[in-house]
Each structure stands twice: as C-alpha cells, then as structure tokens.
C-alpha cells in the first residue's frame, strides 16, 4: 500500500502500462465527458484512477487495475494522468496518487486513496455485488 504526493516529472519517464486490460486512458476533458455519458447510458459504474507516471505505487497497482477491468466488464475503468490533465485533476481535489473514484450515474459513490490492493478489490467486489 502506498501513495505519492507531488513530484516533478521528467520527460524520459514512460507512461503507466495497463496491458491486457480494458482500461480507457483519458487524454482530455471531452474524452472524459464522452466516457461518462457512455457509462451512464449503459448503466455502468465508472472506476476512475487518477495516477502519475513517476508514482511507484501507481505502477505497482496498474496491472491489478488492468486485470480487474477484465474481471468486471460491467464497469468502465478509466485512468487519468494527473500531470497531463492538471486542471481537470485539480477539480477532483487529488492530493495523492493513485486516487480511485467510484461513480454511478456521474455521482461519486466511493473513493480510495493509495495503492491498497485488498481494499481496491474489496470495494470493486462490493459494487459488483450491489449492481
């Protein structure tokens, strides 16, 4: 378990890899709005992962998040790089990465700060059971 709080990003750092999953990378506000509208139309719960390429815990939890996106196709898994979308991320009051928001019909129903795999799995499973 862990989280990162602020660090300057170097240009050499790679993006976080969500290989093998069904994670949608959000690159701008319009893309976010489109995905939220799509999820609402389809009745899907959105799990939004605010992370950063330089954040070690974000990199550790990424394969878990990707795997969950395969296990729970009834949800929409999104990821937002806080450095690429600084203003948008600030509007969500991100204080540490990773931060996960759970949204139903566009409204926040839960939140998790940090790369706490057991807690993330518990929250996602609970949402799956209640859906």
From Swiss-Prot:
The record marks 56-57 as: Contributes to redox potential value. InterPro entries: Thioredoxin-like_sf, Thioredoxin_CS, Thioredoxin_domain, Thioredoxin_H-type-like. It is found in: Cytoplasm. Disulfide bonds join 55-58. SUPFAM superfamilies: Thioredoxin-like. Probable thiol-disulfide oxidoreductase that may be involved in the redox regulation of a number of cytosolic enzymes. This is Thioredoxin H4-1. It comes from Oryza sativa subsp. japonica (Rice).
